[in-house]
């Protein structure tokens, strides 16, 4: 069952859509996984969308999923084909990191209110993981402590060869690394799982692993999982488009959810 709610956003069209996907079977206090996309990302239940596909995998296991998409000027991503930079400027020109973070927090809170009858997990990819860490590790963050946080390709410092992206909207106002490091040290959650693709060209492995190491959790409550041959976005396996990275993520997550 699919439900859509629209929240007031901070920028552009002023809308933060949240799609809630409930499993066909299962009642009671089902776990909720709230998904946050990466910078300039698009997240929906549409077939072929990374977040929609992963949500369906978790749905089949009995979890409720909520997909949050942040506010922007336009939503016609397909118009720009592979020109990611043109898309970033057209859809997000003038948007700040703080605005994007506020959208993410609003989406998390609304999804938890609407569908969080069981344990609540926040799953953030790349920038979405940064939003999840800050929201759960800063005093003025979430109104609740999530049961668990899952990161996908999230670190506190990007590779030097990728620094050109820091001139793009949102990223050009991203806070210094020490803010994320402090949030990791003060993280309020019961469990932390981080996935990292061995072919990640955005974040060095050590900057992702350190966020897990810093979290104030027992060793058995935090995991850092390297998926061999997978890219930063978890869309390819050894250079070829593949859904396998998402299947690996879901296979790790399902036992933790239940």
Label for each model-derived stretch:
Residues 81-114:
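Alpha/beta-hydrolase active-site loop
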Residues 105-172, 176:
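Primarily recognizes the serine-hydrolase "nucleophile elbow" in alpha/beta-hydrolase
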Residues 1-28:
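N-terminal cap/lid segment of alpha/beta-hydrolase-fold proteins
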Residues 25-74:
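Short, surface-exposed "cap/lid" segments of acyl-processing enzymes
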Residues 158, 199-203, 232:
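Acidic catalytic loop of the alpha/beta-hydrolase fold
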Residues 187-188, 194-196, 200:
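Short beta-strand/loop motif that positions the catalytic acidic residue
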Residues 76-79, 219-258:
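C-terminal catalytic histidine-bearing segment of alpha/beta-hydrolase fold enzymes
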Residues 48, 190, 204-214:
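Short alpha-helix in the alpha/beta-hydrolase fold that links the catalytic acid
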């Amino acid at each position: 069952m699919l439900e859509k709610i629209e929240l007031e956003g901070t920028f552009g069209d002023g809308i933060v859509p949240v799609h809630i996907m409930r499993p066909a079977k299962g009642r009671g206090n089902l776990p909720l996984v709230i998904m946050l996309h990466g910078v300039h990302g698009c997240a929906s239940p549409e077939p072929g969308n990374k977040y929609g596909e992963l949500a369906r995998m978790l749905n089949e296991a009995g979890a409720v999923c909520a997909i949050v998409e942040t506010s922007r000027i336009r939503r016609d991503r397909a118009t720009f084909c592979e020109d990611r930079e043109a898309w970033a400027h057209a859809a997000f020109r003038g948007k700040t990191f703080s605005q994007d973070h506020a959208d993410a927090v609003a989406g998390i809170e609304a999804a938890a209110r609407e569908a969080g009858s069981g344990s609540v997990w926040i799953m953030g990819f790349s920038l979405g993981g940064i939003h999840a860490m800050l929201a759960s590790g800063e005093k003025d963050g979430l109104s609740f402590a999530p049961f668990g946080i899952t990161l996908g390709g999230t670190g506190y410092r990007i590779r030097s060869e990728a620094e050109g992206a820091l001139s793009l909207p949102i990223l050009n106002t991203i806070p210094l690394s020490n803010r994320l490091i402090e949030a990791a040290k003060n993280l309020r959650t019961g469990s932390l799982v981080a996935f990292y693709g061995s072919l990640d060209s955005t974040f060095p492995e050590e900057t992702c692993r350190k966020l897990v190491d810093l979290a104030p959790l027992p060793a058995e409550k935090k995991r850092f999982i390297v998926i061999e041959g997978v890219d930063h976005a978890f869309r390819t396996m050894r250079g070829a488009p593949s859904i396998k990275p998402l299947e690996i993520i879901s296979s790790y997550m399902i036992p933790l959810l239940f």
